[in-house]
Amino acid sequence: MRTTTTSTTHLLIFLTWLASIASASAQSTKAKFDPNEPLEKYNMPPAYIYRLETSPRMISPFGAFISFQVNVDAQGNNILGDAANEPSIAVNPTDGSKITIGWRQFNSVQSDFRQGGWAFSTDGGVHWTFPGVLENNVFRSDPVLGAGDTGNFFYLSLRETFFDDIWRSTDGGQDWTRLTFGDVTGGDKQWLTIDNTQGMGHGFLYQAWSTGGNNFGGRQFSRSTDDGATWMSPIFIPNSPVWGTLDVASNGNLFIGGAENFSSPFRCVRSSNAQNPAVTPTFDQNTQVDLGGNLLFGGGINPGGLSGQCFLAVDRSGGPTNNNIYMLASVEPFSGGGTNVMFARSTDGGLTFSVPQRINDDPVNPNKWHWFGTLAVAPNGRIDSVWFDTRNAANNTDSQLFYSFSTDGGVTWSPNVPVSGAFTPFEGYPVQNKIGDYITIVSDNTGGDVAFPATYNFNPGTGQHEQDVYFVRVVPGGGPTPTPTATATGTPTSTPTATPRPTPTPRFAPTPRPRPTPGPRP
């Protein structure tokens, strides 16, 4: 019975993989938003794990960049048969060597039951400790992490009920304490930001979520004024933007970016009084933003998920670009065909935005995908953007992580640079046909820390590559010790030299090359 079940599962996985390849290559069946989009809900029980097997941890160098596997066991090994995706990263702003990453942890690819996984590093991302999940056998999804200015980490997690809860770590991500109990906030695709300015909203936590998987009649926003312990009753956001993020300007104004109609147009919504604990926040500015296309759900590159969310970030450098607002997303052009990383900026507090600007600098090709685009702003005002890119793939689907930066407020961007080897996004699916919905980056004055999923490890038991979470540090110019190119407003946080600890012999990824479509397993 075990052999028959396993063979059937492998056949289904292979057929799904073939369908994904055909969809991505043909470019003829890409779907816009479906109101019946699968939400992050409990579908299957945890899979029984007969025996936990391991292989050496993956370390994948590419030029001057090295990607380190994050989801490893207590001995530093890769865990065969599991899956990890949708990573969110937080970095201690007072000590850049202390990093934590949360992700959707699937203990077995035989079940889409997922939990709140996390790992921490104390040496700048070279070595990682994966203690386990927030709560054993508790369904969780959509992990979103953030850091307060004193170094506390926060972990926002969606539960199967479509309510969320928030956890805090005061020791660099080694231990977590749940702060909220009961059903007070949350919905599908929730996001978090923390007010790290020195105004009256200092330390406030803000979160917004989708109108889908929503228990509050479409209300999407809440605030905590006591470090996450309690939250106000949710309120409406004008035009109901979804699948986006939030950030706070240096004057304490809160900005929310997202997509209207689960597609486009995009919105930038401001609250200037959310920082005032004595009032219920109101939204006093609402701007339509053109990013040159639509957010895409069910595209051929990530069939069961998004091709990326909308990311909003605010410049708090104190320099010439201070309080600029930036929005970026991987969008499908209105004419159709693939996705591009598109960017717009506001220099007047979100009142108006620039025309959309294409960040990926390869020739326009509707068969190529530039997906999971994200961005962050460094304390010195440099903007970093990373995304998955298929420009070098003969099959138009094998993906690499690419990087570009801007030191003039997004007016010009550096030539795009690949920073990882290529991987196939169609293998290692944990029943659901996606590799998450987003990747994340945190920037400091000398570079950016990135968390992303990839399928570098190969599992001989399934005959497929596996979804795992990786960390890579990107730097302007690609050198190991970059110098900031804009005026810094604080002491730069450099990446410390790692102190090695005993680990198994790492396995290195080969130089990426186009791979043929694999044949079926018998």
Can you name each region flagged by the protein language model?
Residues 479-521:
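Ser/Thr-rich, Proline-interspersed low-complexity disordered segments
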Residues 5, 20, 273, 348, ...:
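Sequence-pattern detector for short linear motifs
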Residues 22-26:
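Sec/Tat signal peptide C-region and signal peptidase I cleavage site
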Residues 27-481:
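C-terminal PAP-associated
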Residues 10-21:
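Bacterial N-terminal signal peptides
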Residues 2-12:
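Bacterial N-terminal signal peptides that target proteins for export
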